[in-house]
């Protein structure tokens, strides 16, 4: 990324707190998310990375006792997506998610990708076929599955299943894509394929990724946030975070002194 090009703000958390019942898991997190860039969230287990990520598409709404305090604004309209007046289904149409382990539906390859389109009210077969092909192509798996779209998704390899899940997320044309440790269950070759795919996707989408893999964060991201005990310790350009961090705790974590 050229230093002369100022990134555009796509979303922003503002003094975000999150509670699992009485437990305060996130503490006053204010963090920018830049448009068409990859932002990595790093930190030890239990630091709040995935909790923070799941705030962006209101996944916590699915469980009673969880509550938010603060805002996440989504541009260009500046809407606070955590507002109870905002439909979480609409949020999930704008912000899609790919999980740690591939989670294809017990349906055909075609229907896995078409699912979100049908939810959006698209039923015309020719439109579905066009958009499914586009999503599978953008997820770099079309050539591997184009002759077996009626096969069950479970018949695919782990790496193929994860790319199928990415295609499913892409099909609804989201503004932001969330990746929660998307390669932790994959072998090195499949991991490299997903990382290469993310580099291509950021040309059109804004990406937030949670990873425990420091090398992966350094390879794929433009910006990195280090979280610890529910707080942001440091946020900066990824190169600076990994070479000359401002906070000693960041350096200690990256170099393996704790974590």
Swiss-Prot record:
Q: Which residues bind ATP?
A: 43-50
The cellular location(s) given in this protein's UniProt record come to:
Cell inner membrane
What region holds the ABC transporter domain? 11-254
The Gene Ontology CC terms held by the record are:
plasma membrane
Q: What is the gene called?
A: pstB
Q: Subunit info?
A: The complex is composed of two ATP-binding proteins (PstB), two transmembrane proteins (PstC and PstA) and a solute-binding protein (PstS).
A Pfam family matched in the record: ABC_tran
Family in the record: Belongs to the ABC transporter superfamily. Phosphate importer (TC 3.A.1.7) family.
Q: Which PANTHER family match?
A: ABC TRANSPORTER I FAMILY MEMBER 17 (PTHR43423:SF1)
Q: What is its main location?
A: membrane
Q: Which UniProt keywords apply?
A: ATP-binding, Cell inner membrane, Cell membrane, Membrane, Nucleotide-binding, Phosphate transport, Translocase, Transport
- SMART domains in the cross-refs: AAA
Task: Provide the E.C. number(s) assigned to this enzyme.
Answer: 7.3.2.1
Which organism encodes this protein? Geobacter sulfurreducens (strain ATCC 51573 / DSM 12127 / PCA)
- The name this protein carries in UniProt is Phosphate import ATP-binding protein PstB
Q: What does this protein do?
A: Part of the ABC transporter complex PstSACB involved in phosphate import. Responsible for energy coupling to the transport system.
């Amino acid at each position: 990324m050229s230093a002369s090009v100022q990134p555009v703000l796509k979303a922003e958390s503002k003094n975000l707190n999150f509670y699992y019942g009485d437990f305060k898991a996130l503490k006053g997190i204010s963090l920018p998310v830049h448009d068409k860039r990859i932002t990595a969230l790093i930190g030890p287990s239990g630091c709040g990375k995935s909790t923070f990520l799941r705030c962006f598409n209101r996944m916590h709404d699915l469980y009673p006792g969880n509550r938010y305090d603060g805002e996440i604004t989504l541009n260009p309209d500046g809407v606070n997506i955590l507002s109870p007046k905002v439909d979480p289904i609409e949020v999930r149409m704008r912000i899609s998610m790919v999980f740690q382990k591939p989670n294809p539906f017990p349906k055909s390859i075609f229907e896995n990708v078409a699912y979100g389109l049908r939810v959006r009210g698209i039923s015309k077969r020719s439109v579905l076929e066009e958009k499914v092909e586009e999503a599978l192509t953008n997820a770099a798996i079309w050539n591997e599955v184009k002759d077996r779209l009626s096969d069950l998704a479970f018949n695919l390899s782990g790496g193929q299943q994860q790319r199928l899940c990415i295609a499913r997320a892409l099909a609804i044309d989201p503004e932001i894509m969330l990746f929660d440790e998307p390669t932790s269950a994959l072998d090195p070759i499949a991991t490299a394929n997903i990382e290469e795919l993310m580099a291509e996707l950021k040309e059109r989408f804004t990406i937030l990724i949670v990873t425990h893999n420091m090398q992966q964060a350094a390879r794929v991201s433009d910006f990195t946030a280090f979280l610890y005990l529910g707080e942001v310790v440091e946020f900066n350009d990824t190169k600076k975070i990994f070479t000359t961090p401002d906070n000693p705790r960041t350096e200690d974590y990256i170099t393996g002194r704790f974590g």
